[in-house]
A protein has these predicted regions:
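Ribonuclease/tRNase effector modules and their secretory precursors
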Residues: 1-92
Length: 92
């Protein structure tokens, strides 16, 4: 995916960087992982389909939550993958 295919809320991106030490720009590269695992995010139900992408960025396994809006990928959050996500990725 190209960088201009992504969008996010700048305040949310700054808060995410402070909390998780992962920028949304770097996190967008999760889709470059040929083994990226994409699942529907069933934990959130605010009327908008959300997805989780689990993949490696610079050797670190991360999980991003995102949605699709008007042919763009809107990143909602990004963090290091938890143990459950690590196992799902390893077994995919």
């Amino acid at each position: 995916m190209e960088a201009d295919e992504f969008e996010w809320d700048d305040a949310k991106a700054a808060a995410n960087l402070r909390k998780h030490k992962i920028s949304f720009r770097a996190a967008s590269r999760v889709f470059d992982d040929p083994l990226v695992l994409i699942e529907q995010d069933v934990a959130e139900d605010d009327g908008e389909d959300r997805f989780l992408a689990i993949g490696r960025v610079e050797g670190v396994l991360i999980t991003i939550a995102y949605t699709e809006r008007d042919d763009r990928t809107r990143i909602i959050s990004a963090r290091k993958a938890n143990n459950h996500e690590q196992r799902a990725y390893d077994h995919s």
